[in-house]
């Protein structure tokens, strides 16, 4: 009788414990916001990376901001933002790039390599340029498309704003001692350059390949249909297009690094996100837009 009573009490206690467990709420991790600012050239890949990361960790919220590489690096030196996306080469005395105050505290993690695509309107008959021709165009020495083998018509220049990593690269690799003509239309983001060129048959501009990845001739994923429907045309430069292969091998003339920058060694959630970006899954996402680093 006593044994039976003990068994009943044990069953009752176990049932009560199960009910209590079922009614208990599963603890949800508190939301965490990570702010990333900087390069607009990296906006497409960062959007894809953060979307993928949030699907794995729903409590992580990303606040993506622009501002450009130069302003982004200045802001993170001052302790603002969790991460900055930048396409600027690190300071190097051998190249004349001196380190601003506070730069020694920055940690640059390379995540990929970008190439600047030279774009024109699809109706433009010009398909290829040399670096010298590109410099002459943007310095204002060449004013008419007819001089380049195209139809007669004024050349409309579209450039990025001062401080943009894309503009800095363009000025260093293309312009040299020359200056971009003051007649150039200045746009704040790469997407704005694409939109302007797409709407102006006389325009020429330069943008990150991320904004033209589906329309690059010679790219493995580019289809004939995509080229036919592309809003802009990517030009050959010195006989090469900015494909992932030519960019990764540094065979294309206008390449630049892609960095995620922290003030001090990355830690905690920031470290975990960077680890994801460098993982096979993250690098596969980077490869949709740029040349991956791994």
Residue ranges and their predicted role:
Residues 1-4:
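N-terminal secretory signal peptides that target proteins for export/translocation
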Residues 8-19:
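Bacterial N-terminal signal peptides
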Residues 21-99, 104-294:
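Exported/periplasmic ABC-transporter solute-binding proteins
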């Amino acid at each position: 009788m006593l044994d039976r009573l003990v068994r009943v009490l044990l069953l009752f206690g176990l049932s009560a414990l199960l009910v209590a467990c079922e009614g208990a709420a599963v603890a949800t991790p508190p939301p965490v916001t990570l702010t990333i600012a900087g390069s607009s050239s990296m906006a497409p890949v960062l959007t894809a990376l953060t979307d993928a990361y949030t699907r794995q960790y729903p409590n992580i919220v990303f606040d993506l901001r622009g501002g450009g590489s130069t302003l982004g690096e200045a802001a993170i030196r001052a302790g603002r933002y969790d991460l900055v996306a930048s396409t600027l080469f690190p300071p190097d005395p051998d190249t004349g790039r001196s380190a601003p105050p506070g730069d020694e505290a920055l940690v640059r993690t390379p995540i990929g390599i970008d190439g600047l695509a030279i774009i024109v309107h699809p109706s433009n008959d010009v398909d290829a340029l040399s670096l010298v021709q590109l410099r002459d165009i943007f310095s204002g020495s060449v004013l008419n498309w007819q001089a380049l083998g195209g139809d007669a018509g004024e050349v409309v220049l579209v450039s990025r704003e001062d401080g943009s990593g894309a503009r800095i690269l363009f000025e260093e690799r293309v312009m040299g001692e020359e200056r971009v003509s003051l007649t150039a239309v200045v746009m704040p983001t790469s997407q704005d350059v694409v939109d302007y060129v797409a709407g102006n048959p006389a325009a020429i501009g330069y943008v990150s390949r991320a904004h033209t990845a589906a329309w690059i001739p010679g790219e493995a994923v580019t289809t004939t249909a995509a080229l036919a429907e592309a809003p802009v045309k990517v030009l050959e430069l010195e006989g090469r297009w900015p494909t992932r292969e030519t960019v990764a091998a540094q065979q294309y003339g206008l390449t630049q690094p892609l960095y995620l920058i922290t003030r001090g060694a990355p830690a905690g959630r920031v470290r975990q996100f960077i680890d994801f970006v460098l993982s096979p899954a993250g690098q596969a996402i980077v490869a949709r837009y740029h040349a991956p680093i791994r």
